UniProtKB/Swiss-Prot annotation:
[2Fe-2S] cluster binds at residues 122, 195. Binds 1 [2Fe-2S] cluster per subunit. This cluster acts as a Lewis acid cofactor. Its EC number is 4.2.1.9. GO terms for molecular function: 2 iron, 2 sulfur cluster binding; dihydroxy-acid dehydratase activity; magnesium ion binding. This is Dihydroxy-acid dehydratase. One of its GO terms (biological process) is isoleucine biosynthetic process. The gene is ilvD. The keyword Amino-acid biosynthesis applies. The active site is at 518 (proton acceptor). Signal peptide: none annotated. The modification N6-carboxylysine is found at residue 124.
Length: 617
């Protein structure tokens, strides 16, 4: 029978000093036999997805205490990728994932916490906490801050839903007036919560449901809706129950590595492919699997991408569908339900809230449940009032979207496409693979051949795209030395993809990079090219004007030069000595913190995880 970890610091005569300190935090005599639950919050006023979390940690803490536990809250850092985008601030985004994971480990292990509730929301916070949960393998429940309501603008054609990507595209479009840009800017992000489309934050919060580590509704219930409070209340009670089951009943099935097994990772990736989730989820699932010693790899993602259809399309893949619409159609449990009926997921797996995923679907899939309370839950609607306050409205739709032929969520027979929403491509410039969000690629350019336009920084590419005539239809914008080591930090290329759209080139050009893309990116945007240029990848050998061939249906990407020519170029590169595999003219200040990250990080094909074996003494 496992012992409560907290007893290391709460029991025994020699722990009198530690108990004295615990007492100074408010603990009483009767508390020292209770499970100590870490409430891992991520409140910050920098990030709209986190501005409303300040009081939610204490909400969970009070519920933990009601259930018989002792709650102790702390915060992690949280970077807003949208605010950090387009400048050197983005160098810090992906590295912050590792810092978040480490900070959770440090706090939980230093204080011997028995279990934890992870209150996350935005892009790197959920992955960082997920990595920590898999690393620590103590009972854990995830509850996110929830998506923001979609912005709305009134046009001559009627009301249109918008988000920050629309504002960015409008701002770079010379045909849009300053006044209209102002309207878009003021309307794009109306409430607290993670950005309203199927961007990275919402994708990851949806995947925690598929992994079995979060309550149903976690990925789709709006941050502003009163229904979301129930998730926080239930999480507080659930985590105490899970802790007791593990420490008092020796039930290891509740642990993260038991719940988030290989099959659960397959479920999560299947969901991601079916809903056209962010390509960043590939990085994060690989990293979380690595922490939990789950043998889930790019090869598994490639295998799944060839058999899973697209059942749901959300902004940025389509213009007018956002997370609030997915929720009305039954949320993530409805998508999982359709995947189950198609024989595409495993349902014999445990979750933190149900004995099996099959049991969870019986209760929460709106197409099979008879529960009126579940139907009411998924009718939660946006309030339409700008606010930074959680649970501030309780509006409901009159009905659910149960149309599986033409609705927001489709059944397998009426899929948007039989080919999945993400694909892994391989070829002579991506021997270890690269990722494309096929759900956001127009059918006319699934096969594309063009001339390489070489840039060794995102900034240089942006300057060229915005300069009239420098980038033409048919070009392949190739941005390199922006990978995990080369950046360092693997910047998101949201501005280049958005500006290509602004210039009317969104369906006429491709963008290929060893960096990554925002969940808000769409178009023929191919990222995570591995090995990256800074690691000696062949993307570093492509020359201006080379022909790049992209064939998504056949999963191929290559530069149309012979192996002999590539070998000659490689020899010439290696002959440069210390200057080899480095950008020629880029001037970028790289801090010691980022240098340390670059020294230890690995390829995007491995999730850009840290590898301490790189250390040389």
């Amino acid at each position: 029978m496992p012992q409560y970890r907290s007893r290391t610091s709460t029991h025994g005569r020699n722990m009198a000093g530690a108990r004295g300190l615990w007492r100074a935090t408010g603990m009483k005599d009767g508390d020292f036999g209770k499970p100590i639950i870490a409430v891992v919050n991520s409140f910050t006023q920098f990030v709209p997805g986190h501005v409303h979390l300040k009081d939610l940690g204490q909400l969970v803490a009070r519920e933990i205490e009601k259930a018989g536990g002792v709650a102790k809250e702390f915060n992690t850092i949280a970077v807003d990728d949208g605010i950090a985008m387009g400048h050197d601030g983005m160098l810090y985004s992906l590295p912050s994932r590792e810092i978040i994971a480490d900070s959770v480990e440090y706090m939980v292990n230093a204080h011997c916490a028995d279990a934890m509730v992870c209150i996350s929301n935005c892009d790197k916070i959920t992955p960082g906490m997920l990595m920590a949960a898999m690393r620590l393998n103590i009972p854990a429940v995830f509850v996110s801050g929830g998506p923001m309501e979609a912005g709305k603008v009134l046009l001559s054609t009627g009301e249109k839903k918008v988000d920050l990507i629309d504002a960015m595209i409008a701002a770079a479009d010379d045909k849009v007036t300053d006044a209209d840009v102002q309207v878009m800017e003021r309307s794009a992000c109306p409430t607290c919560g993670s950005c309203s489309g199927m961007f990275t934050a919402n994708s990851m919060n949806c995947l925690t449901e598929a992994l079995g580590l979060a309550l149903p509704g976690n990925g789709s219930t709006l941050a502003t809706h009163a229904d979301r409070e129930r998730l926080f209340v239930e999480a507080g009670h659930l985590i105490v129950d899970l802790a007791r089951r593990y420490y008092e009943q020796d039930d290891a099935s509740v642990l993260p590595r038991s719940v988030a097994s290989f099959k659960a990772f397959e479920n999560a990736m299947t969901l991601d492919i079916s809903m056209g989730g962010s390509t960043n989820t590939v990085l994060h699932l690989l990293a979380a699997a690595n922490e939990g010693e789950v043998p889930f790899t790019m090869a598994d993602i490639d295998r799944l991408s060839r058999r899973v259809p697209v059942l749901c399309k959300v902004a940025p893949a389509v213009a007018n569908i956002h997370m609030e619409d997915v929720h009305r159609a039954g949320g993530i449990m409805a998508i999982l339900g359709e995947l189950d009926r198609g024989g595409l997921i495993h349902t014999d797996l445990p979750t933190v809230h149900a004995a099996t995923m099959a049991d969870a679907l019986d209760r929460w899939d709106v197409k099979r449940t008879k529960s009126e309370s579940v139907a009411t839950f998924f009718r939660a609607a946006p309030g339409g009032v700008p606010t930074q306050v959680a649970f501030s409205q309780s509006r409901r739709w009159d009905d659910l979207d149960l149309d599986r032929e033409t609705g927001v969520i489709r059944d397998v027979a009426h899929a948007y496409s039989k080919d999945g929403g993400l694909a892994v491509l391989y070829g002579n410039i991506a021997l270890d693979g690269c990722i494309v969000k096929t759900a956001g690629v127009d059918a006319s350019i699934l096969k594309f051949t063009g001339k390489a336009r070489i840039f060794e920084s995102q900034d240089a590419a942006v300057e060229a795209i915005l300069s009239t005539g420098r980038i033409q239809a048919g070009d392949v914008v190739l941005i390199r030395y922006e990978g995990p080591r080369g950046g360092p930090g693997m910047q998101e290329m949201l501005y280049p993809t958005s500006y290509l759209k602004s210039k009317g080139l969104g369906k006429a050009c491709a963008l290929v990079t060893d960096g990554r893309f925002s969940g808000g990116s769409s178009g023929l945007s191919i990222g995570h090219v591995s090995p990256e240029a800074a690691e000696g990848g062949a993307i570093g050998l492509v020359e201006e004007g080379d022909t790049i061939e992209i064939d998504i249906p056949n999963r191929i990407i290559r530069v149309a030069v012979s192996d002999e020519v590539l070998s000659q170029r490689r020899a010439a590169m290696e002959a440069k000595g210390d200057a080899a595999w480095k950008p020629a003219d880029r001037k970028r200040v790289v801090s010691q913190a980022l240098q340390a990250y670059a020294a230890l990080t690995t390829s995007a094909a491995r999730g850009a995880v840290r590898d301490v074996s790189r250390l040389r003494r």
